[in-house]
């Protein structure tokens, strides 16, 4: 269950890049995100509402420059929206709880799903399984 936060207060605490990504559907520069090379065991949450989205076991190195996962934590974690921006069709992924922009999903990922959830670090908050440390993206 998502930790209930005051949305206005939480959005006011976002950095410029976090706000650009989550609220304005922006994209951080490739290979720039804090969580790209994170190898720790834990849960990746939505930065805005702390809804659990992905677990470290589904993370893989796709070489694309953004954290990549082959599946979300559960079906309700993610909302899918057809995106026709930039003269192409993609599938945008948003937080299923607060609607924050996360990134896009592509059908070029590894098994068992064949999907690649390409997620901006700036939209995530990582919680370490060992010590509970939180690392905002």
Swiss-Prot record:
Taxonomy, superkingdom: Bacteria
UniProt keyword list: Metal-binding, Oxidoreductase, Zinc
Binding site for Zn(2+): 46, 49, 95, 98
GO molecular function: peptide-methionine (R)-S-oxide reductase activity; zinc ion binding
Membrane-crossing residue ranges in chain numbering: none
Any one annotated GO CC term: cytoplasm
Biological process (GO), any one: response to oxidative stress
EC number: 1.8.4.12
Catalytic site: 118 (nucleophile)
Catalytic activity annotation: L-methionyl-[protein] + [thioredoxin]-disulfide + H2O = L-methionyl-(R)-S-oxide-[protein] + [thioredoxin]-dithiol
Essential cofactor(s): Zn(2+)
Cofactor: how bound: Binds 1 zinc ion per subunit. The zinc ion is important for the structural integrity of the protein.
PROSITE patterns, per the entry: MSRB
Domain named MsrB: residues: 7-129
Record-stated family: Belongs to the MsrB Met sulfoxide reductase family.
PANTHER family: METHIONINE SULFOXIDE REDUCTASE, METHIONINE-R-SULFOXIDE REDUCTASE B1
Protein name (Swiss-Prot/TrEMBL): Peptide methionine sulfoxide reductase MsrB
Organism: Yersinia enterocolitica serotype O:8 / biotype 1B (strain NCTC 13174 / 8081)
Organismal lineage: Bacteria, Pseudomonadati, Pseudomonadota, Gammaproteobacteria, Enterobacterales
Name of encoding gene: msrB
